[in-house]
C-alpha cells in the first residue's frame, strides 16, 4: 500500500467531517450520518484503490451506511475507471460519523474515521455488540479478558507504576455500565464517562498527552475493529469478545430474535460469541493507515470551524508500519472544493 495514500485518506475523512458539520446541533443524527456517508463514499471513489468495505455500520440502528461488501475506488467509478493505471487492493473499515447523537446535539468528541489495510487485514465482525479492554503501549501484554476486570486493573496499574487513585478509565456512559462506573469509582479510580464514541476513547489510551490509561466496556463491534486497527498502529493492546444483543439489552422477543440472527452471522464467518479475540485477531497486519477528523471539538481533535465558506479541520493520521502520528491542520475554501462534494460540504 503506497504511503502517499495516507494523505488521500485524510482528504476522505476531512470531506466527511465538513459534510457532517452542517448538521451539528440540528437534532437530526440520521441526516448527519447520511451526509458523512455520502461525502466519504464520493471521495473513496476518486482514489486509485480496489477497495472493499469490510466494516461498516447501520444494521443495529438502521442508519445509512457504506455497506459491508460495497466496492469503492476509481475502478468502480464509471466516470474515471478508464483512466486508472494502477490500484491498491485494500480492505476498509469505516465509521463516517462516530457520535451521531453528539453531532446532532452539538456535543464534543464527534469524529469521522476510517482504517485501511491490505486484503484480509481486519476481522469481518457482524454488526453487534462487543466487550472491549484496551490499553496503551506501556501496558501491552498485561491484559487478559479471561480474568476478572479487577485483576486486569491491578496488572495495568503495576505496569504503569501507578496507584489505583491515579488511574483513569474510559467507560461509555450507558445504562448498561451504571454499576460498572460505580464499582470503579468505589475503588478510587477516575472514570471518564463518554456519552458515545469509544474509538476516540480507545485512541486516548495511546496518546502521550492523554491522562487515559484504559478503556473498558461494551460498545459496537464495528467500532471495536476500527479501534483495534489504530491501537495496533499505535503499539497498544486490546482484547475483546462478541456479545449478543440479549446479553447486553436483556431478553425480549425482539432482542432474542436479533440475537438468533447475530449467532447465525457469527457462525457464517467462523466466529464464536463470547470467544476472546486478541489484537492480532482483530487487526492482523501492521500495514494499516488510520485517519480521523474532528467534527465537534473534543479531547482527541479540534472540531470543524467555519466562517462563511472558509473552514478549518484537524485530522489525525497514523501509519502502522512506521508508527508515525501526524496531525494535519487544513484550511478549506469551500468554493473550490471538488465539484462532486461541493453540495455536501458548502
Label every PLM stretch briefly.
Residues 1-93, 158, 199, 285-286, ...:
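N-terminal subdomain of lithium-sensitive/metallo-dependent phosphomonoesterases centered on the IMPase/IPPase/PAP
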Residues 5, 204-346:
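Oxyanion/phosphate-interacting regions
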Residues 87-98, 102-121:
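DPxDG-like acidic metal-binding loop motif
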Residues 115-193, 286, 298-300, 313-343:
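Acidic beta-strand-loop-alpha-helix segment within the catalytic core
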Residues 184-193, 198-204, 208-215:
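Glycine-rich ThDP/TPP pyrophosphate-binding loop and its adjacent helix/strand module
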Amino acid at each position: 500500500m503506497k504511503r502517499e495514500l495516507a494523505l488521500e485518506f485524510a482528504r476522505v475523512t476531512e470531506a466527511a467531517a465538513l459534510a457532517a458539520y452542517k448538521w451539528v446541533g440540528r437534532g437530526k443524527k440520521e441526516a448527519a450520518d447520511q451526509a458523512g456517508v455520502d461525502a466519504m463514499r464520493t471521495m473513496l471513489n476518486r482514489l486509485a484503490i480496489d477497495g472493499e468495505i469490510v466494516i461498516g455500520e447501520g444494521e443495529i440502528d438502521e442508519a445509512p451506511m457504506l455497506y459491508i461488501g460495497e466496492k469503492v475506488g476509481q475502478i468502480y467509478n464509471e466516470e474515471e475507471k478508464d483512466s486508472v493505471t494502477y490500484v491498491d487492493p485494500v480492505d476498509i473499515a469505516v465509521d463516517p460519523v462516530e457520535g451521531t447523537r453528539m453531532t446532532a446535539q452539538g456535543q464534543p468528541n464527534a469524529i469521522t474515521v476510517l482504517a485501511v489495510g491490505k486484503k484480509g487485514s481486519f476481522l469481518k465482525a457482524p454488526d453487534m455488540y462487543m466487550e472491549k479492554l484496551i490499553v496503551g503501549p506501556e501496558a501491552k501484554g498485561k491484559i487478559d479478558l479471561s480474568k476478572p476486570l479487577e485483576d486486569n486493573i491491578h496488572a495495568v496499574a503495576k505496569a504503569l507504576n501507578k496507584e489505583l487513585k491515579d488511574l483513569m478509565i474510559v467507560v461509555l456512559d450507558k445504562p448498561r455500565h451504571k454499576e460498572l462506573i460505580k464499582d470503579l469509582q468505589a475503588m478510587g479510580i477516575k472514570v471518564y464517562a463518554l456519552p458515545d464514541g469509544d474509538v476516540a476513547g480507545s485512541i486516548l489510551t495511546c496518546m502521550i498527552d492523554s491522562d487515559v490509561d484504559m478503556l473498558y466496556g461494551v460498545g459496537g463491534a464495528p467500532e471495536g475493529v476500527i479501534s483495534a486497527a489504530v491501537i495496533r498502529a499505535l503499539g497498544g493492546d486490546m482484547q475483546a469478545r462478541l456479545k449478543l444483543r440479549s446479553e447486553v439489552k436483556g431478553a425480549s422477543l425482539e432482542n432474542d430474535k436479533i440475537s438468533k440472527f447475530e449467532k447465525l452471522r457469527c457462525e457464517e464467518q467462523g466466529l464464536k460469541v463470547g470467544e476472546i479475540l486478541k489484537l492480532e485477531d482483530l487487526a492482523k497486519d501492521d500495514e494499516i493507515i488510520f485517519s480521523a477528523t474532528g467534527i465537534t471539538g473534543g479531547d482527541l481533535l479540534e472540531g470543524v470551524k467555519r466562517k462563511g465558506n472558509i473552514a478549518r479541520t484537524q485530522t489525525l493520521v497514523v501509519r502502522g508500519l512506521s508508527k508515525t502520528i501526524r496531525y494535519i491542520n487544513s484550511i478549506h475554501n469551500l468554493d473550490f472544493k471538488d465539484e462532486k462534494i461541493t453540495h455536501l460540504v458548502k
